[in-house]
């Protein structure tokens, strides 16, 4: 399997921007945990079938797709239901991510996982790349992008791993504050580093 670089960062840190630069500039294959999480609950999948069996058919729309708003309501204030859902989906998502990583054809792969730290998924990665920004930058970007209040943005931030927790597991860091060095320059340096590691078959 290709060298796997786990890409993570807090909300509004710029993970998607960084991943897209790797893909567009250097043709690096990407496995995105958010996309995988949607795929494993598409109509007809064992994941969605189990959710329907547990919560009832009205957890889906008329076209048999998952009604995410309803599911959020069911688990929002019910820790037991949330735990049940996580116990169902986390192993399926993990298995699908491994499958997708095995299909990679580029020299190395980016595994984009917003909650890499929280869900202990760094075990799937050879290296961890953290997109790091100041909390104030995250707050202002979240308010602007997601049309939420500052209070809501702070609450989202508080629910995620701390900046320090992410940096503690980082092998590499991309700085993405407004005054930091050019993003593409940082990514080009990392790309060259990862290619050199692939050639030497180094994992750490």
Curated annotation (Swiss-Prot):
Molecular function in Gene Ontology: ATP binding; dephospho-CoA kinase activity
Keywords linked to the UniProt accession: ATP-binding, Coenzyme A biosynthesis, Cytoplasm, Kinase, Nucleotide-binding, Transferase
Gene Ontology cellular component terms for the protein in this record: cytoplasm
Against SUPFAM superfamilies, the record matches this protein to:
P-loop containing nucleoside triphosphate hydrolases
* Compartments reported by the entry: Cytoplasm
Bilayer-crossing residues are: none
User: What's the catalysed reaction?
Assistant: 3'-dephospho-CoA + ATP = ADP + CoA + H(+)
In the Enzyme Commission scheme, what number(s) does this protein have?
Answer: 2.7.1.24
Give start-end of the signal peptide. Answer: none
> What EC class is this?
transferase
Residues that, per the record, bind ATP: 12-17
List, alphabetically, the InterPro entries matched. Answer: Depp_CoAkinase, P-loop_NTPase
Q: In which pathway does it act?
A: Cofactor biosynthesis; coenzyme A biosynthesis; CoA from (R)-pantothenate: step 5/5
A biological process from GO? coenzyme A biosynthetic process
Q: List residues of the DPCK domain.
A: 4-201
Q: Which family does it belong to?
A: Belongs to the CoaE family.
What is the annotated role of this protein in its UniProt record?
Catalyzes the phosphorylation of the 3'-hydroxyl group of dephosphocoenzyme A to form coenzyme A.
Output this protein's name. Answer: Dephospho-CoA kinase
């Amino acid at each position: 399997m290709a060298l796997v670089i786990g890409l993570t960062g807090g909300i509004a840190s710029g993970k998607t921007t960084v991943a897209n630069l790797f893909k567009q500039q250097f043709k690096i294959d990407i496995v995105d945990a958010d996309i995988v999480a949607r795929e494993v609950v598409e109509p007809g999948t064992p994941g969605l079938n189990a959710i329907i069996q547990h919560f009832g058919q009205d957890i889906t729309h008329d076209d048999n797709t998952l009604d995410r708003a309803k599911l959020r309501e069911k688990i929002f204030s019910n820790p037991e239901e949330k735990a049940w859902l996580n116990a169902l989906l986390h192993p399926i998502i993990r298995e699908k991510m491994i499958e997708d990583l095995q299909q990679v054809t580029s020299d190395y792969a980016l595994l984009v996982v917003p909650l890499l730290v929280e869900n202990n998924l760094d075990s799937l990665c050879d290296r961890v790349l953290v997109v790091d920004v100041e909390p104030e930058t995250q707050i202002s970007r979240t308010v602007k992008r997601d049309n939420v209040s500052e209070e809501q943005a702070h609450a989202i931030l508080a629910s995620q791993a701390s900046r320090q927790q992410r940096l503690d597991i980082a092998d590499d860091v991309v700085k993405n504050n407004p005054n930091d060095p050019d993003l593409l320059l940082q990514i080009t340096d990392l790309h060259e580093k990862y290619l050199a590691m692939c050639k030497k078959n180094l994992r750490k």
